[in-house]
Amino acid sequence: MNRITIAKIILLIVFFTVFKDNSFNYEIDKIYPKLLILRFNNKKYMNDELGKISYRYEGLSILDGHNFPASFIKKSDRIYELVKKNNIEYVIGIYDSESFLHEKLHAKYYFNKKYKQKIDKEWNNMKVSKKNKIITFLKNLGYSDKVLIDEYQAYKYSEKDNFFNLD
């Protein structure tokens, strides 16, 4: 092999190593047909693509998974056309399977009125001291007031029993 061929091979290896993970796949959910699920190949690219939208919605941009109503997507966001074309109301984004349940629970809270009523009732009937501990915990994670109940239910049903350190 000559030097030019070796240089081309090295360049291709570097190119595919650097750029291979900057992609995502998408699917329309079968249970909630107005839900768009974005599956990213790496966390950094996911946060680069969805972080600004999540920040508009919940006050955080660097996350292990993203969820937001489509109304928070601007024309300048790269996923705008995909969302518009498919008449999407809600989006979740993940880069690994560990965060899928958590993000899907956000969609359930958004789409399933009975489930939302059940969670809201549970929250409203909770002892004030317990609720205040959960609020403090979630605010320390950086969540805004408007998503506290939604985050509470997603963590409660996707994490270990004592996730909120209430014991």
Residue ranges and their predicted role:
Residues 6, 33, 46, 75-79, ...:
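Short amphipathic alpha-helical segments that mediate assembly, nucleic-acid/protein binding
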Residues 1-8:
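N-terminal Sec-pathway targeting helices
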Residues 98-111:
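Active-site recognition of the HExxH zinc-binding catalytic motif
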Residues 110, 114, 160:
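Glycine-rich, acidic and aromatic/proline-enriched surface loops and short helix-turn segments
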Residues 114-123:
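Short acidic alpha-helical/loop segments enriched in Asp/Glu that coordinate divalent cations
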Residues 84-91, 123-167:
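Metalloprotease/metallohydrolase-associated module, dominated by Zn2+-dependent proteases
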Residues 8, 12-91:
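A metal-dependent hydrolase signature that marks the N-terminal structural subdomain at the beginning
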